[in-house]
Structures are given as structure tokens and as C-alpha cells.
């Protein structure tokens, strides 16, 4: 057993759990699985110094990613740096001013179909302490006043819009000509209506996905104890409680999460952000520890020496995995 054995152990556990109780008793080498799970947990615990992983990855991003940071699309890297108290290169804001000035339309939209472009920038710039109502003379909030526009991107659009609006406790703009004005209540209701029978959320289909479930929880977390959710407060609490149970149940026996059949770091990252938003410690809460391995342990098992994270265990350092992994650890440590 090594730190790279997670996929094999998870597959073996799935095969074992699919058997009837009678058939399980016939598996002569079942103790090998149990011992492998315990050994894996010990290896992960002994090999990982989580705070060091967080610090070294932050150093790596600051030192090596200046070119990546100085462009639209690097918002998750910027968000992690800004929220961790590190410096964001000045070139990033200059690049954003240029991008906004070249792409924004008369309705304040950076993209005709993706409201998340506005939302992501609002999240990043708010974390930097920038004025999102005056980026090269343009107000990024304006587009988020139109519910139809937000809902064009379905679940993702609504999640990001709510996160963006709440990141600075922003008032929602009144958009002239909008058929349906956006409100926080309408965005929350959309998420509640989209919750699946199993208690989670999915980009498509009727089975919960860890990433979308975690992201929906992130968006609803601020309303868990009512806030301005009004009469929806009770419904939000019930929905989030169900989702937390679902996320706990989806965790693999090696502490991680699978998406489309692959054990990966990004799913673990999203779950960590969701749990910290609720005040749940993802490293110590028993619901998110399997065979001694927490979801934070799982994320850190994808760490690449020198800083950064892999997408999958046998992969190379990955930009998206690194951005989300660092952002997740920032949410955990801040």
C-alpha cells in the first residue's frame, strides 16, 4: 500500500460492498481490504503536513504564475491569493480593465449567455478590495439584476450570482427592461427547486454530484441561519442539512470524492469550501472522515512536491486543481 493506492482500494471496497452479507462471508481475503484501508490512512496521516502544503502552494502560485495571473480566467487563483492575504500582481487588474472594456455590452454583460463571467470577476475583485461598480468605468453588478439572464446558465449561473452578490453584500441592480428582476429570494428558490430527491444537486441527470452539491451548499450557506432569506429560512436549513448528509454518504472509503468515475482533487476542494462555509471542520468532523482519512487528507494526497495539486492521482500538476485546492485550503485556514 502506498499513497497512490486510493483508486485500487476504493474499487475493491465498492466491489465488496456490492455483495450480499452471505457472499461477503465467503470472501476469504476480505481482511486484506480492511488492512489496506487502515494502512492507507496511516500513510496519509504520516506523510501530510497540511499547513506546509498550503504555504508551499501559495509560494508556488505567487512565484511561478505571474503570467497566468495577469489574464481574465485566473479568478480562482486570484481569489485564493487575495483571501489568504497574499499579494495579487498589479498586472491582473490592468488585464481585467482591458478585458472588461473590450467585452462588456450595453447591458453590462461580459458574455451574452454566461452570467458567471460577471460573477467570477465580482468575487475576485471584491476579495482584492476593488470597486466592482467601476471597472474601467463599467458596473459589473448591473447584469446580475436580470433573473432571465442569470438563469440562462441554469444552476451554475444562479450559484455564482448568489455567491457574487453576497461576497460584498451588494444591492441588486434594477435593470431597465428586465422581464423578471433578480432578487435573492428568487435565486434561493431556484436552488431549492433544483434540489434532487436524493438531497443533492447535479449539472444534469437525477443523481447528486459532489461538485454541484457542494457549490449549491456554498451559495446557500449564508442563509442557513435565516439572514435575509425570510420565509425561505426553514426550507434552506432543511435543504442544506440534507445536502450535508448526501456529501457525507458520497465520500469514498479513502476519504475523497469521485466525479464521473474518477477520484479527483477538485471535488474534495469544493466539499471543503462548502463545509467551512457552514462552520463545519472538514478535517475533524466524523461525518467526513472515512477509515481515518478526512476530506482534507484526501485533497492533500493530490499535492505535488514544490506546490500545486493534481487532478487525478496519476496525473501531473494541473492549473485548475491547483487553483481550487489552494482556494479550498484558504477557506479552511482563514
Named regions from a protein language model:
Residues 93, 137-141, 184, 188, ...:
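Core helices of alpha-solenoid repeat scaffolds
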Residues 45-69:
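N-terminal module-boundary/linker segments of secreted carbohydrate-active enzymes
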Residues 12-18, 191, 247, 299-307, ...:
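A composition-driven surface/loop motif
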Residues 141-153:
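Asp-box/WD-like beta-propeller blade repeats and closely related beta-sheet repeat scaffolds
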